[in-house]
Amino acid sequence: MEEKIAAIVLAAGEGKRMGSGIPKQYMLIKSRPLVYYALKAFEESTVDEVILVTGEDEIDYCKEYIVDRYHFNKVTKIVPGGWERYASVYFGLEAIEDADYVLIHDGARPMINAELVQKCIYYVKKYRACVVGMPSKDTIKVVDEENYAVRTPERKTLWQVQTPQCFEFELVKKSYEKMMENDDGKATDDAMVVETYGNVPVKLFEGGYDNIKVTTPEDVRLATNRVRVRKIFHKLHILHDKLIYMQMKAYKKRFKEKKQKK
């Protein structure tokens, strides 16, 4: 029996740091709403089901202008989010009726693609709990209440954690249920919930430094440029494949002609 893979896309944030008055997940990147890119990546992957978590007042808008408009057929439910990210994840997990694995992704990370999703699926099946990230390029300081440095962790031990964050479904669901029972709102990512309540080690694997989370106007500009570059490279790859195909046809024709002459 084939294992079922579900995904949760979080798009319920208010985007206060953006200062635009528009929830960041609906800001346009190359004429598409930001959350479009995450949904597109999952639509093009082997994920079976997508749960979209958004603001309660935005459910109808998401259905009509994003899910239906762009034919995201894998989105089976659009559910209202919670007061914090962890609550939105919990509601997303509650909306999944049946799954073996779940990938949890921030809708404000547009640089995800189907290739990264497939990588996530491979690693979660192998390790049960895994997270996309990248080794930190910068030195990180631990500071006190007055912003004085108190400790400098060894940089080679530090990673910048991203999403998707991927888990066995029952493992992460039970971990979140325990967290909610304890009224514990300290977790800043899903891996921390599983580390604390699931008693399972979380494997980190490399995604890409361009897998940024859009939270500021500067991030919008960066994401727009990166989407543009990705489209250019995609077109170049298509052109390259067409040239190879045409060359192969030409070689085949010449070989056939030489054979006929003999």
PLM regions: where:
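N-terminal glycine-rich phosphate-binding loop and ensuing alpha1 helix
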Residues: E2-I59
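Short, high-confidence coil segments that cap the C-terminus of an alpha-helix
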Residues: V47, F72, A99, K126-A129, ...
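Short beta-strand segments
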Residues: I8-A12, V53, I104-H105, V132-P135, ...
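Short beta-strand-to-turn element immediately C-terminal to the catalytic PLP-Schiff-base lysine
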Residues: I29, K141-D144, F205, V214-T215
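Conserved N-terminal catalytic core of the sugar/cofactor nucleotidyltransferase
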Residues: V35-D98, N182-D183
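Hydrophobic packing residues within well-ordered alpha-helices of enzyme cores
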Residues: M18, F42, C62-I66, C120, ...
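Conserved alpha/beta core of the MobA/IspD/sugar-nucleotide pyrophosphorylase nucleotidyltransferase superfamily
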Residues: E3, W159-K261
